[in-house]
Regions:
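Primarily recognizes Gram-negative and organellar outer-membrane beta-barrels
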Residues: 1-445
Length: 445
């Protein structure tokens, strides 16, 4: 629901606009995926494989917008230019060959998939329209693994894949939920090709220590990016939709130039004092995201660091606990000159305990603290406390009936930041208030 009120004064004349909108979105998706592989040894330590992959995805979206004019008593009216009934079918066939061979401490894998894909879109309302795209892609892959010894190894992996545009990205209906930031889809979008390269080093010791270091890079050709323009005067879009001066319209387009770099360090070791394991990690991600703003291509750079510590313990088969803390340090900077840098930190601390006591009774409790720094005063820190009480029964305690209570303190919130071509959007949403659920669980062993 959107309630909109506007008053403009121009040349001594005041014009008032007032209306309410209700949007009904009904979306359905069906998918099917299968994979067949045959492997045949050809010589010692060398194997040849052949595979066939099939996937099918059907998506339907019925998006209707109803509007009532606050200045009249006409009731709700269906707005055709803001409504759409759209269906997409994405079908892929891929045949591939692969070669695998082992040589002392080395293991090599090399392969390629030859993929044919079709994307069909059909709009049946408000006007009939169809699109059809066919694609042929060669998607190579490779892996090299070198083992220094049984507990010490390197692995280099390369993969490529394709991604089809979503139904929401293809629907050309205009969304004016926020009249200052209009958005629409683009039925002419093409598929996106992804290339991923990862290097991993793993070390484990007899004393239970583990060290993992990872480096990664991702390149996306035909990345589905935002193209945004700002109206320099009041204009009317196709379909009769009004766009005020200073408002902006964003639509998706395919752009090359997206890349991201990832790194992660993890160190784990046992802590005998409380019969637990400690895991320390640091992850980092840098992404350069292409956009178009007022016809000029630019890049938004996003940098994220996530330090994390986890202490997990299995004191016995009846009692365990986990303590953890992580901080997500976020920085975003656009190449658009007038856009300021966005910096904020999200802190998450969590304590979890599970206890099975007298006569198969179980008690579980999780308390999570989420805090923010660098954001507006409207974003509040909060605690989320969930707990459950259950009873195990039947042979080997295979069954359990349980009462779960969620958000006992009633403080849960939802927050998300999105980075646009020339803006940062901080989104908060209402979440389900405290509730309880009774469940029955049966474990098959």
């Amino acid at each position: 629901y959107t309630d909109y009120k506007e008053s403009k004064t121009e040349d001594g004349t005041t014009t008032a606009t007032e209306y309410s909108q209700r949007k009904d979105n009904d979306e359905k998706q069906t998918s099917l995926r299968t994979n067949l592989m045959y492997t045949e040894p050809i010589v010692d330590n060398v194997q040849l494989s052949a595979n066939y992959k099939f996937s099918y995805s059907n998506s339907d979206a019925d998006k209707k917008t109803f509007e009532s004019d606050g200045m009249t008593d006409l009731g709700e009216q269906l707005i055709d230019q803001m409504s759409s009934v759209y269906q997409t079918d994405y079908l892929t066939h891929a045949a591939g060959l692969g070669l695998r061979w082992n040589l002392d401490r080395w293991r090599f894998t090399l392969g390629a998939d030859f993929q044919w894909a079709s994307l069909d879109g059909e709009q049946s309302y408000p006007v009939a329209d169809n699109i059809s795209h066919n694609y042929f892609s060669v998607l190579p892959s490779a892996m090299i693994r070198y083992s220094l010894d049984r507990n010490n190894s390197f692995m280099l992996r390369y993969r490529s894949s394709s991604t089809s545009p979503t139904l929401q990205q293809l629907q050309s209906v205009v969304d004016n939920t926020n009249p200052l930031f209009l958005s629409t889809g683009n039925p002419l979008l093409d598929q996106q090709i992804n290339h991923t390269l990862n290097l991993r080093y793993t070390l484990t010791t007899m004393s239970g220590q583990t060290f993992i270091a990872m480096l990664g890079a991702t390149l996306r050709n035909g990345y589905v990016a935002d193209s945004t323009f700002v109206a320099t005067e009041d204009i009317t879009l196709p379909g009769g939709i009004e766009m005020d001066k200073g408002a902006q319209l964003t639509r998706p387009v395919n752009l090359d130039g997206y890349y991201s770099l990832q790194a992660m360090l993890t160190y784990g070791f046992p802590l005998d004092l409380i019969r637990s394991n400690v895991n320390l990690s640091l992850a980092g991600n840098y992404a350069s995201v292409p956009t178009i703003f007022n016809g000029v291509k630019s890049n938004t750079r996003e940098l994220t660091f996530v330090p994390k510590v986890v202490i997990g313990s299995n004191i016995s088969d009846k009692l365990d606990f986990t303590l953890s803390y992580s901080a997500s340090i976020n920085k975003a900077l656009s190449s658009v000159a007038d856009l300021n840098t966005s910096n904020y930190v999200t802190h998450i601390a969590q304590a979890r305990v599970g206890w099975t006591f007298w006569a198969g009774l179980t008690l579980r409790s999780t308390l999570t603290y989420t805090g923010y720094s660098g954001l507006s005063a409207d974003t509040e820190d909060y605690f989320l406390w969930n707990a459950s009480l259950g009873k195990k029964f039947l042979k080997n305690n295979a069954a359990e009936i349980r009462l779960d209570v969620y958000d006992i303190l009633g403080q849960s919130q939802s927050f998300r930041q999105s980075v646009g071509s020339n803006y940062y959007d901080y989104l908060t949403a209402n979440v389900l208030q405290p509730y309880a659920m009774v469940s029955f669980v049966y474990t098959i062993r």
